[in-house]
Amino acid sequence: LGATKDGIVKGIDLYTLSNTGAYGEHGPTTVGLSGHKSIPLYGKAEAFRFVSDVVYTNHMSAGAYRGYGATQGLFAVESAVNELADKLGIDPFVIRQRNIVHEGDVMPAYYGQVNTSCALDRCLQAVHDNIGWDEKYPVRDMGNGKVRAVGMGMAMQGSGITSVDVGSASLKINDDGFYTLSIGAADMGTGCDTILAQIAAEVLECPLDN
């Protein structure tokens, strides 16, 4: 990271080395998201570079799973931001407040897209207030030889592929007065079959059994 003395992040340089296993599969796209989902969080960066290498190894081929590469890049960048805050003597919350991308900002690190929807500033403030950050940061002496501390990190992650993975549902009333809800979501432990039926029943003001 490169930053001014008051903590404005001006440059980000990120390198990711990814193990894709025996076959390519998702290798290039997964590693790409480690930069694609981390660098754009910091809207004041004027220079940024993302370099990655994907290597074959004698392991099971890698695939998509929970975060899809974003978590690795975010962990690295957020750790570096915390180190920067410590080096400059600035509260990690404050340094993020000064740098985060806001709604309406153009994001050069995100293909120049305009951020049309973003509540990151409000989310950050809510976390700060609800956990009592000012009372707990940096550490609190418990008086028994132990201390308690708080830390902070940010993340962004979308769901699906833009313009490809889209969601829809159809609701039909049957001759017998019952409803049929048709969805394309697969319940992989998320409970969507139950949850979406509950939502429909609430909106229709009918029992779930209907």
Positions of PLM-derived features:
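Gly/Pro-rich active-site capping loops and adjacent beta-alpha segments
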Residues: L1-G73, N144-N210
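Glycine-rich and small/hydrophobic secondary-structure elements
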Residues: L1-K5, A62-K87, P108-W133, V150
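Structural signal for hydrophobic packing residues in well-ordered secondary-structure cores
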Residues: A3-K5, T20, R49, V81-L88, ...
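Molybdopterin (Moco) oxidoreductase catalytic core of the xanthine/aldehyde oxidoreductase family
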Residues: K5-S34, K87-Q125
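Helix-loop-helix junctions that connect adjacent transmembrane helices in secondary transporters/permeases
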Residues: I100-F178
